[in-house]
Regions:
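Hydrophobic/aromatic-rich core segments of domains that either
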Residues: 23-32, 44-49, 184-204, 213-226, ...
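N-terminal accessory/pre-domain segments preceding catalytic cores
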Residues: 16-207, 249, 278-281, 297
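Bacterial Sec-dependent N-terminal signal peptides
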Residues: 1-23
Length: 297
């Protein structure tokens, strides 16, 4: 009887382990010619036993890559070039919107080539992103109390929005609004919770992510350095994605949330959900004040 119990236990243990390994192998197979890049990431973290948690994080990202895509090809690159000329010109903001809308006639979004992330992502980018996320979690001030599982969901992702370009977004966005946190190290209460820091940054972002336009930007593919804080868009989706990237670059555990339609009106809406400890979240709109007061720590 004891032997049967041990046998069943080993079978169960093996099946649980193989399920994860099967999913990992499935993605590695789907990655085709890019398999060596993904395997390089895994091997990198296998070299040092101290990186065992980073290895788990790498597996988590790779196993969840199916369904996540990125633009590739010359059309999107040409679109970026033309968009940069418009956005960083001396034109008034409404003129920029008109020109960006007209640019979509020359570069229709349906014509942009895209591929699954697992087939194009580079090992160096993924390793850099994982290391940066771990530094923010373990060495930063605003997410020390969250679990590894929450870390994987709220901080680890290598991009913040679908079709975001693979670039150095964390380091580029990290300095934004840092002046608002200069005095926090002298206040024990403010320095021990992400609530007040996130609130201060969110207020500071008002001039960064909120734009007054006469005519809306119809659509864009500008989630890329150097466009992040320069997009002439007043949509809550763009505002929320930008604020999300900025908050995450600073080491806040944050996610994107939305409703497709309100029960009383025909509109969608989106907002940020910031994890302030292992079981409490605060909700805010990027650049808007105040936060929900009932969620104060």
């Amino acid at each position: 009887m004891k032997a049967i119990f041990i046998f069943l236990f080993l079978v169960l243990l093996f099946s649980c382990q193989s399920s994860e390994e099967k999913q990992l192998e499935k993605v590695l197979t789907l990655s085709g010619n890019n398999r060596s890049a993904l395997e390089k990431v895994l091997e990198h973290y296998k070299e040092n036993e101290a990186d065992s948690l980073k290895l788990r994080a790498a597996k988590f990202l790779i196993m969840n890559m199916p369904g996540h895509q990125s633009y590739t090809g010359k059309d999107i690159e040409e679109y970026y070039v033309e968009a940069e000329k418009i956005i960083f010109s001396d034109r008034k903001i409404d003129e920029q919107v008109n020109e960006l809308n007209n640019l979509l006639l020359e570069f229709p979004s349906d014509d942009f080539e895209f591929k699954e992330d697992y087939s194009v992502i580079k090992a160096s980018y993924l390793i850099q992103s994982i290391d940066a996320a771990f530094d923010d979690w373990q060495q930063g001030r605003w997410a020390r109390g969250i679990t590894f599982e929450d870390f994987c969901e709220y901080m680890l992702p290598y991009k913040c929005v679908e079709f975001q370009a693979f670039d150095d977004w964390r380091n580029v966005l990290k300095p934004i609004a840092n002046d608002t946190l200069c005095d926090f190290s002298y206040n024990d209460i403010w320095n021990k919770t992400p609530y007040h820091a996130a609130e201060a940054i969110n207020i500071k972002l008002r001039d960064t992510v909120i734009v007054d336009l006469k005519k809306p930007l119809k659509w864009h593919a500008l989630y890329k350095v150097p466009f992040w804080c320069n997009m002439p868009s007043n949509s809550c989706e763009t505002r929320t994605n930008t604020a999300l990237a900025i908050m995450r670059s600073k080491g806040f555990a944050v996610s994107y949330d939305f409703v497709l339609q309100w029960p009383t009106k025909a509109h969608a809406h989106s907002w940020l959900s910031i994890l302030i400890d292992h079981d409490r979240r605060m909700v805010c709109e990027g650049g808007h004040d105040p936060f929900l007061a009932t969620l104060r720590p």
